[in-house]
Structure formats: C-alpha cells, structure tokens
C-alpha cells in the first residue's frame, strides 16, 4: 500500500481542504491562524511531492526507463536511491565478481600455462571460499529483485517476464548453492554457473532489447539455414558418388575446400568444377544471403524495440508535465480540466532537481528562462527536452587580446587553419625521413650503424614541434590551446619527444659523423631513437580530423565501440555459457603426450586415438587449446571464432570424447561466426551510413561537437513519436498515478 494518496484522490482532498479553509477564514483568533498554518504546510508538502515526481519522471525519460512505478514520496526516495551511482556501482560490481568466480573455482585457471604438457595448477580454492563470495552476491541480487518488485508493484511484476525469470534464476542458483555445500563442493555439474550470465543480461535494458531481437530473428533465418543444410547434403552425396573410385585418403579428414581441391585437381582437371561450384554456392551466395536476411530482420526487430524506448522518453516527459499541471491547479484551487500550462519557476525548480549531464541541463535551463510568458505549455515543455537529442557544440575560451598591431597580425596568422596544414606536412616529411633511414639501415648491423642522420633529423623536427606548440599557445592562450583535444595530443607527444631528445643529448652528446655510442643509463641510443620514432608515428594520427572521410571513419569507430556494449555483452554471455558447457563436456578428455610432465594421465588412453598424422591436433601442437579450465575454454572458443581450424577440433574431440561433440562446435559456429558476426556488420553499416548522412548536413559543419551517437539516435529518423492522445491514454493507465480525466 502506498503511504501517500494518489494524484486523483489528492485533487478532491485538496478541494475539500480549500473549502474548509474558506469557512474557517471568517473566524478570527488563534484557531483560525493554526488552520491556515496547517493548510499551508499540507500545500507545501503536496507541491514538493509533485516536483519530486516530475523530476523522477524526467530522469526516467533521459534513461529510457519505464515510469510505471510507485509515485508516493517514500517510494520515490527509494527509487532514486536504487538508481543512484553508488547503488548501481555495487550491483555492477557484484555481477562482475560472480562472473569472475569461474576463473578461480575448480577447475582453477590459476596456472602459468594451459598447455597440457606443462600445466600445473598453482592454487585450488578450499571448499566454501568461492561459495561464500557467491552467497554475498546472491544476497545482493535478492535485495535487487525485491526492491524492483516493490517499486513496480504486484501487477507490473506479473507482466514483467524478465523479473519473473530473475526470480526463478535466483531460486535455482540458491538451491544449487545449497547442494554444492552439502556435497562438499565435489559435484561435477553446477547448474548455477551456466545461469550466471543472466545477471549481466537482465541488468541492461539495451542488452535485453538486443537479446529479444536475436530471439525473434533466429526463426526468420531457419529457411536459409535449411537451404544451407540441403546444399551440404546434396554436395556430400555428389562427392560420395563422384569420388567412389578415387581413393583419396585426405577426403575423409580435411574439410577446407582449397586443401581438397588441389590434390583432386592434380588427378583430373574436371574435379575442380565440383569444388568451385561448392564454394561459389555455399560461401558467396548462401552465406551472403544469410547476412542480408539477418541484417534486415534484426534491424526491423531492433527498430520496434527502440520505438519502445522513444515512447518511454515521450511518456516520461509528458507525465512530468501532467503532475506539474496538477500542482498548478491545486494552487489556483480549480479543477483539473484547466491543466494546460505550468509555471516557468516550477519548471526551473524541477530542472534543478533532475540528475543529468551539466551541458544539457544548462542549455535546457537557458531555454526555459528565455520564455517570454510565465507559463509553459505542453508543447513548449516537450520542446525543452529536444535538447537531449541535439549535438552539444563545444564553446572555446576567448583568444587573448594583444594591444600591439604586430602581435595581433601574428595571432591571426598562427590561429589560421593553414598552420595545421603546415604541421601535418612537416609530420609527413618527418615520417618519410624515418622511413628512408630505416630502409638504409635495414641490412646494417647495429654496431656499424651511423646515427648522425637520425639524430639531426629528429632533433630538428622536435625543435619545430616545440616552436609550433609555443606559437599555438601564443595565438589561442593556454586555456584555448588545452581546449582542443588534438592540441593536447600533440602537446603531450611533443613534451615526451623533447624529454627523450634532451636525455639523448645529455648521455651521448651532439650528433656527429660515425655517431654510435655504447649503452649508457636505462636506454641505449638506438632504443631511444626507436621509441622516439614510434611516438612520431603516433603523432601522425593528428591528420585524421583534417581529412573529412578519414574523420568520418574514425568517429564511426569510436561511436561503434560505445554502441557495441550491448551486443558485446550478448557475446560475453554466449562465450560464458559455451565455455562452462565445454568444461563440463570436455575436461581432461585430451591426454597429454607421453614425453610431457603430465604423461601419467595417458595410461588409460587407447593407442588407436593417439596419432601424429599431418594436420591433426597432436601434430600441429594445439596442446594449449583445450577445455580443462574456464580461461583455456574462452581462448579455445576465440580461436574457433577467428581462425579457420574447425576440422582440427572436430577431429580430436570426436576421437577422444564422442562423435556427438561435433554438435557443440557446430552450435558455436552458428552463434559466433554466423549470427554475431553478421550483426556486427549490420551495426557497422548503420553507424557509418548515419554518420555519412550527418556529415553532409549544413549544421555544425565547421564546429567541433561533443556528440556521441547512441543506438536510439542511429534509428531516430526511422521512428515515429507517439501522439498526444496516445500519451494521455497511457498515463491514465498508469497503475500508481491517477490523473484527472478532464479535457486538455
């Protein structure tokens, strides 16, 4: 039960309170004064509650959170505490800790190497240590689900599949934890380890949307997968018929097309047509068709999910306006039918309480103060928060003012873009000189090299970089110089280069013919020069912002890193689950070789499984790639994802474990190399296309902006904002907020 009356009830209660106050105002004396003080106190509490509700709704809109939570004063305080930075940090830390336990639990990953020939575990945790840490994390998660359930209420809890699943996962993990302790940590299969990635998944709304889109996309691509399976079946049957008389031993072991094609082509020219047709249809037609379908289907489902986020933002902003209108109607003592405007001062009070970025807050407050009237309409209130979608253009400090005309002209010259172009040209010339020196000394032993050319060139260019830095500080001032990220990058590298050059001069003196001193101090001359050359190569990156297309690619890359967090999180979940399952299925299945320190483990292995045939696991020396612990399993899965060596692992685990182990590797191939890689390509395309379109927009073309594009911003042009009627209807269906039903 809520401790405060709901909004609809407060409106009627306030009218009764106002009527009672008017009756008592006719009387005089201390009783009348106390009544007015009591009414004033109640009014102040209501106004504070409305402002608090509006601030929370706006914060929900900024973070794309639902507003269907409790709105009484106590619940709002709990709500803001739950979403505070400290509370979320504790929750995220608990998720990180419980995921990291897999590295320390049996089988422990605390060994110098995962190589089967030399692997020796340094330390195994005693029973109860990791379980105790896990219990603390589970208790935090239980508190988390209890707080969420209370804030949403029972009705919303029943509608939330994620909260129900969260509760079930916690219950299963707790039961499995109790079973582990009762068996003294000796059980082989721990179900809760497979369930742990769910805690990471449910903590991110964007990750949940991406997962939902993945789940809905998979059935759509089954037709292409069936076509791909039919393609494999058809060509397998043709190969069995075609190569029946040709005794080709490698055909039963190799699966890479080119390795099969070359020996077959040496026997008969026509055999190459089979392999060309197989790779052309499978690799270039069906796989690219699969990429297109995954991109199209996932983009459609992601659009629908992002549409929900846009509705949440609009609903939060409109909900804040509606509760502020109730506050205004209570002040005037009128019914809710006149809730059309909000006082500007009230809006400013709300904005001061909202937790948001300082740049956006300052701009929104500036826009609110610019209103000519004292009242803000719903449309104006919504327009205020359009600033959240706009680029925040960085304002630079003013240039220093010089009184002498000569200094003013110098300032104009050295603050021009021409100085940047000259600087880029000088860095390019410096790189050419370094390249010439490296080519010249490539075949010369270090003891016979002459450092005169490199020393003179590097010293001269470092002096130029210092001069360029000083002139920019003169033109822009120290604050203006430091306000540009490119200047900070150049200045830092220039200072490091100057320190290296000075240390070289102090230790080895000035460059001269035949300059090749011995080692003195921490670095030799050649190591100092090599480090300086590496920094100069990094300094050449300053050219990126000055080339439009290159800058576009670079900014797309940085935005991609930010927006990939949700999709990378899903990949982490997949890695975690497959690694745990791999450890359960394949731990200690592959024996170490006979001449290793762990050779005693091979005593019970059939000699038929041991082979040094070319291209096998044993012959290639893949001993570090195994599933004997969690860390080794992660690395093995990564190798399978990025390296085309599937046949090696399919062969070895079919021999030592079971032929059915191939299903595990095929499933990982579908998840990693087919689905996730194609989603990665789709996100790159969306990000780059959106950046390309914006790069030709006339606004902000010549200004440096502090804009980081989110996934919602990427798809904003393809989304529709809800109508006012739709928003009001959704607000009236709020389980804890009862607005008046008067006309707007």
Where are these regions (language model features)?
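Cytoplasm-facing ends of alpha-helical transmembrane segments in multi-pass membrane proteins
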Residues: 139-148, 183-207, 466-472, 530-550
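Non-transmembrane regulatory loops and terminal regions of cation channels
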Residues: 1-136, 154, 183-186, 206-460, ...
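Cytoplasmic-side transmembrane-helix entry/capping segments in multi-pass membrane proteins
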Residues: 159-168, 483-492
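C-terminal ends of transmembrane helices
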Residues: 145-158, 469-482
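C-terminal "tail" modules appended to repeat-scaffold proteins
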Residues: 485, 495, 730-731
């Amino acid at each position: 039960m809520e401790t405060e009356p709901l909004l609809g009830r407060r409106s009627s209660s306030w009218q009764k309170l106002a009527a009672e106050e008017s009756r008592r105002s006719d009387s005089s004396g201390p009783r009348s004064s106390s009544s007015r003080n009591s009414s004033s106190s109640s009014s102040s509490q209501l106004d504070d509650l409305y402002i608090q509700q509006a601030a929370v709704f706006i914060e929900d809109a900024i973070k794309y959170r639902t507003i269907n939570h409790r709105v009484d004063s106590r619940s709002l305080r709990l709500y803001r505490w739950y979403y505070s930075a400290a509370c979320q940090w504790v929750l995220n830390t608990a998720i990180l800790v419980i995921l990291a336990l897999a590295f320390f639990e049996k089988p422990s990953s605390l060994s110098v190497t995962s190589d089967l020939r030399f692997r020796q575990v340094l330390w195994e945790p005693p029973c109860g240590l990791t379980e105790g840490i896990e219990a603390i994390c589970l208790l935090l998660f239980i508190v988390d689900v209890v707080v969420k359930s209370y804030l949403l209420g029972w009705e919303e809890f029943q509608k939330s599949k994620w909260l129900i699943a969260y509760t079930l996962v916690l219950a299963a993990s707790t039961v499995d934890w109790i079973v582990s302790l009762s068996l003294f940590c000796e059980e082989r299969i721990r179900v809760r380890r497979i369930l742990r990635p769910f805690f990471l998944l449910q903590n991110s709304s964007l990750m949940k949307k991406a997962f939902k889109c993945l789940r809905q996309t998979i059935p759509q691509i089954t037709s292409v997968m069936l076509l791909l399976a039919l393609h494999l079946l058809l060509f397998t049957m043709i190969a069995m018929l075609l190569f029946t008389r040709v005794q080709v031993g490698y055909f039963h072991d190799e699966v890479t097309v080119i390795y099969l094609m070359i020996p077959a082509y040496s026997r008969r020219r026509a055999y190459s047509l089979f392999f060309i047709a197989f790779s052309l249809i499978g690799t270039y037609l069906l796989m690219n068709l699969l990429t297109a379908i995954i991109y199209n289907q996932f983009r459609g489902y992601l659009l629908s999910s992002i549409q929900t986020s846009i509705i949440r933002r609009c609903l939060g902003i409109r909900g804040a306006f509606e509760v502020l209108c109730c506050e205004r109607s209570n002040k005037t003592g009128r019914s809710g039918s006149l809730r059309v405007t909000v006082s500007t001062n009230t809006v400013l009070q709300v904005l001061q309480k909202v937790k948001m970025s300082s740049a956006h807050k300052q701009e929104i407050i500036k826009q609110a103060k610019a209103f000519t009237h004292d009242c803000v309409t719903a449309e104006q209130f919504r327009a205020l928060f359009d600033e959240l979608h706009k680029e925040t253009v960085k304002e630079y400090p003013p240039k220093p003012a010089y009184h002498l005309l000569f200094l003013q002209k110098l300032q104009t010259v050295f603050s021009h873009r021409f100085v940047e172009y000259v600087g880029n040209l000088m860095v390019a010339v410096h790189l050419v000189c370094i390249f010439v020196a490296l080519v010249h000394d490539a075949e010369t032993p270090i003891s016979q090299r002459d450092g005169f050319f490199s020393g003179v060139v590097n010293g001269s260019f470092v002096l130029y970089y210092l001069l360029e830095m000083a002139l920019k500080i003169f033109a822009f001032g120290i604050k203006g110089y430091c306000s540009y990220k490119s200047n900070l990058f150049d200045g830092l590298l220039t200072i490091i280069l100057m320190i290296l050059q000075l240390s070289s001069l102090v230790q080895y003196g000035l460059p001269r013919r035949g300059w090749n001193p011995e080692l003195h101090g921490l670095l030799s001359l050649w190591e100092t020069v090599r480090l300086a050359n590496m920094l100069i190569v990094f300094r050449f990156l300053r050219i990126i912002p000055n080339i439009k297309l290159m800058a576009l690619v670079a900014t797309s890359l940085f935005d991609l890193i930010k927006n990939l967090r949700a999709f990378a999180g899903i990949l982490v979940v997949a890695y975690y689950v497959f690694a745990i399952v791999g450890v359960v299925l394949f731990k200690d299945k592959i024996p170490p070789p006979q001449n290793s320190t762990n050779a005693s483990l091979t005593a019970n292995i059939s000699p038929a499984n041991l082979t040094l045939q070319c291209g096998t696991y044993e012959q290639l020396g893949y001993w570090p790639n195994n599933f004997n612990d969690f860390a080794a399993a992660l690395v093995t899965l990564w190798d399978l994802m990025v390296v085309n060596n599937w046949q090696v692992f399919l062969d070895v685990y079919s021999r030592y474990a079971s032929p059915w182990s191939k299903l595990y590797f095929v499933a990982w191939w579908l998840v990693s190399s087919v689905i996730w890689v194609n989603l990665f390509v789709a996100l790159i395309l969306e990000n780059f296309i959106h950046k390309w379109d914006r790069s030709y927009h006339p606004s902000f073309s010549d200004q440096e902006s502090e804009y980081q594009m989110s996934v919602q911003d990427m798809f904003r042009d393809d989304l529709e904002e809800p109508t006012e009627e739709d928003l009001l209807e959704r607000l009236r269906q709020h389980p804890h907020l009862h607005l008046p039903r008067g006309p707007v």
